Regions:
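A composition-driven surface/loop motif
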Residues: 1-164
């Protein structure tokens, strides 16, 4: 889990996600939550679950993704991503506000919600003992977040994209 101002995950080279869970919350203008640099580098996604939320100034998307949105989300709000059957893929309470977010998973049909009530979710341990990041279970209620078009749409798109 990365919570930073500036470039939260700054590879300045090719960045690859192969598995596991990655949660990134970034704040600060002129930067983005994922940054692979500008020299023909790319962000490649081939597995796991990745959520990156932050400033839209230098927002880059991985080679493929399941959900992209330019809906603003305030600090302290919870975003939850579900598969087509309503199962929670990942949930993240944002420590920083977000102007844009991307979510990568092996699912091709993903819905995002803010708020709602989670049940049966497993949370990752954190130093401050908050249930900030987790997976599994179900969600009831919540407000659906609109997906944005542009850039790559769904698994199999390009890389090092700044969609807007």
């Amino acid at each position: 889990m990365l919570f930073r101002s500036g470039n939260s995950s700054d590879g300045s080279q090719t960045m690859t996600f192969n598995g596991g869970y990655v949660f990134v919350s970034q704040t600060g203008g002129g930067n983005g939550p994922l940054d692979c640099g500008d020299s023909n580098n790319s962000i490649t996604y081939s597995g796991g679950t990745v959520i990156a939320a932050g400033s839209s100034d230098m927002f880059e998307t991985p080679s493929s993704y399941s959900f992209l949105s330019t809906t603003s989300v305030s600090a302290g709000q919870t975003i939850t991503f579900t598969d087509a059957s309503g199962n929670v893929l990942a949930t993240f309470t944002l420590p920083n506000g977000s102007a844009e977010m991307v979510m990568c998973s092996q699912e091709s049909s993903v819905t995002c919600y803010t708020g709602g009530t989670l049940s049966g979710t497993t949370y990752f341990a954190s130093q401050d003992s908050t249930n900030r990041c987790g997976y599994g279970g179900t969600i009831s209620g919540g407000t659906a977040v609109s997906a944005s078009s542009g850039g790559n749409s769904g698994p199999g798109g390009g890389g090092n994209n700044r969609p807007f």
